[in-house]
Every structure is written in C-alpha cells, then in structure tokens.
Amino acid sequence: MNDETAPTNKSQEKAELRRGWTTGACATAATKAALTALITGEFPDPVGIILPKGEVPYFQLAYEGLGDGYAMAGIVKDAGDDPDVTHGATIISTVFPAPPGTGVVFRAGEGVGTVTRPGLQIPPGEAAINPVPRRMMTEICEQICAEYGLPADIVITISVPGGEEIAKKTWNPRLGIVGGISILGTTGVVHPFSCSAWIHSIHRGIDVARAAGQKHVLGATGSTSEDAAQALYDLPDFAILDMGDFAGGVLKYLREHPIDKLTIAGGFAKLTKLAQGALDLHSSRSQVDKSFLWTLAEKAGAPESMKDQILFANTALEVLELTQSIGLDMATPIALKAKETALETLRGAPVAVEIIVTDRSGNILARV
C-alpha cells in the first residue's frame, strides 16, 4: 500500500490542516513595516513580529506607500485552511506622527468597523480593534520609536478594502459594529475550524444585550427557527444571538452572566441532540440517538410495531414524520428534555428558559 492509497484518520487530517494568522497579527505586522518606513524610508519585507505566545511569523508585504509625513503597508490575510470570511482581505496600516504626548491612537479606516453600542471590550465611538491587537501594535510602536530615540506619539489607521461587504457575513451588524470588520485575535494564530471565534461572538452578543438592559435573548440553531421565534417576540437585533450549533456557548456564558430569559429555538433534529444532553449540536460532534427517540415515542404511546422503524430510521426528521403519521406529539417531550439540559447547564443561574421546536417550514411544533 503506497501513501496515496493509505487510509487517513481524522487526527491525521486535522494535523495536516494549515494554520493562518488573525487580522490582529496582520495589522501589527503592517504597522511595524509602515512605521519602520516612516522613520527610515525603507520597508522591511518580509516583516516579522512576536506573537503573544512567543512565536515569530514573517509576513510578505502586498502594499507599500510612502508620502509626506505618512507611510502605509498592507498584508493579505492568510487564514490557512480555516473557512474564514476575512481570508484574502488586505489589512492596511497607515501611520503618521501624532501631537506630542498623545501616545498611540487608533482610527478606523475604510472597511474597519466602529463600535456604537456599550457592552463590548472597546467603548462606543472607538475603532473596532480589539484589546490584544491594540496592545501588540502599541508595543511595536514603542519599541521602534525607542530604537530611534523618538516619542511613541503615533496615529494608526487600519483599513480593509471591501471590509464593509465582508462585515455583512459576520456578527458585527448585530453587535452594533458599523462600517466594516473587526480587527481580532488573542494569540495571533487562526486554528483551522476552531469554534473559538464563533463562541467569542456569542459572548460579546450577550454582553451587548446586557449592557443595553435587554431582559430577553434568543438563540436559534438556524434562520428558520429564528424567524419563527421572532414572529412571536420581535426582539431587537442585538437580542438575537448567533447560537447555531453552540448551545453550550450560550448556556455556559449565561450561567456566569445571567439575563432574565433565554429562548432557544431550533429544528427537531438539533433540539433532539440538546434533549440528549449534547451542548455542541454540529453533525460531526454529536449524533441523534434513535434509541433515545424510541424511548420517548414509546412513552408517548407509539406501538411496539413502530420500534424498528424508529431505531433504523435514516434521520430524526423521518422519526418525526413517522410519529406524526399516527398522531403522536414527539416535539413536546423533546422540548421538555431540551429544557432540562439547558437548566442543568445553567446550574441554578437566574435565567428562565423557553424552548421552541420548529419544522423545516418554520411552523412551531412545541413551545415549553
């Protein structure tokens, strides 16, 4: 058996996935190149930076600009094998001297968002550049200026051409970040198919809702169930959490940062997984247990003759349709079990939980 035909396992495939770099790392490298050129007239290319955990990656410059009193450098973001919407975007840093005593000042250029709501790590009115990238860029400026005996009074404008369109594919509009993307990252490294960015956005969404005094938030597994719940409540956009498959990300954060009421809305299959006790509802990380469904169906009055049909059904939807065909309500016991899982995860936190189960057309099958 040769290498081309040798089977691979998931751990091997995962190990072969290529890492990438965050927008914050790219912005820091671009800032280092631009400031170096502003002082010396020469752009370092490639440019290396030290990440928070000590790694030293090097970045090729995709753009250079040197003018009267300013310098610009751009780096194309490489997210590795992660399906990141900012992959391929050009992160540009423009630097110029600030008035004495100003220190390092950050501005949002084209395609970088501005924070408009309280509750985020950055206050309203500021460029959506998160704390770690700000610290990395500030340290770079202080280091370079110290080398040349200059005060670190620098204005840094980060821009991302096309960033306003890219931002429409992110959670920024709901978080009240307008005009573009955020410059993010805590380690500087993008790990392929990591859940951390999504869960981070869920947490920030809860923070924004709490800061706005919102007493009720909605987490949905998809747009169909979200629309069904919104038809009932018409919540403001900042009260809608992009939960997706990460029910645990919502519940565990609310356990520590409670809001009065949480509605979880989802399709039958996703909420069956939550009912089983799964907190990550993605198909690759949790599966529907047909024996669990049969136990509930039997309690609901399903005949013994239906047992094998349920146990060997291809999908949860097939089970739902089978039980509906004889007039059984499977959605309510699923909703009740899902609510049990949610309350157990909250561990007594003062959060009232509502579960809404929908079909694929958005019709509400159960609400408890």
From Swiss-Prot:
<keyword id="KW-0169">Cobalamin biosynthesis</keyword>
<comment type="similarity">
    <text>Belongs to the CbiD family.</text>
</comment>
<dbReference type="GO" id="GO:0019251">
    <property type="term" value="P:anaerobic cobalamin biosynthetic process"/>
</dbReference>
<keyword id="KW-0489">Methyltransferase</keyword>
<dbReference type="GO" id="GO:0043780">
    <property type="term" value="F:cobalt-precorrin-5B C1-methyltransferase activity"/>
</dbReference>
<keyword id="KW-0808">Transferase</keyword>
<dbReference type="Pfam" id="PF01888">
    <property type="entry name" value="CbiD"/>
</dbReference>
<keyword id="KW-0949">S-adenosyl-L-methionine</keyword>
<dbReference type="InterPro" id="IPR036074">
    <property type="entry name" value="CbiD_sf"/>
</dbReference>
<comment type="pathway">
    <text>Cofactor biosynthesis; adenosylcobalamin biosynthesis; cob(II)yrinate a,c-diamide from sirohydrochlorin (anaerobic route): step 6/10.</text>
</comment>
<protein>
    <recommendedName>
        <fullName>Cobalt-precorrin-5B C(1)-methyltransferase</fullName>
        <ecNumber>2.1.1.195</ecNumber>
    </recommendedName>
</protein>
<dbReference type="InterPro" id="IPR002748">
    <property type="entry name" value="CbiD"/>
</dbReference>
<dbReference type="GO" id="GO:0032259">
    <property type="term" value="P:methylation"/>
</dbReference>
